[in-house]
């Protein structure tokens, strides 16, 4: 399971170093567009499981086709290099409006990559409602 918040920097080639805690879990990865203008980083097998699930839904529904196109067309499969770096393609960097300072967060079965300022704003906004939404999202679990 991916956990935690890790500030990192993009180098001049749009690369960042994977946090040490994630390295053993991410040998082959897929990077794609995420929700709220962040990027999702999946282990390749998890990405295949999710994309299979999406592809097995009713392609007769326009919203399913639209989502599938956006989700898969931006995806980039790769292997981290020997220094554990991941390259962010230009179209993905533009989508998430990533600057030099980025934040890598563990989100359970995947990793999210945020522009650090955007992450701080999102976190500040969402933390205020965190306890209030618990009853709706996870009733009786905690």
UniProtKB/Swiss-Prot annotation:
It comes from the Bacteria. One of its GO terms (biological process) is negative regulation of DNA-templated transcription initiation. Residues 5-46, 75-118 form the SpoVT-AbrB domain. PROSITE patterns: SPOVT_ABRB (PS51740). Forms oligomers. Belongs to the MraZ family. This is Transcriptional regulator MraZ. The lineage of its organism: Bacteria, Bacillati, Actinomycetota, Actinomycetes, Micrococcales. The gene is mraZ.
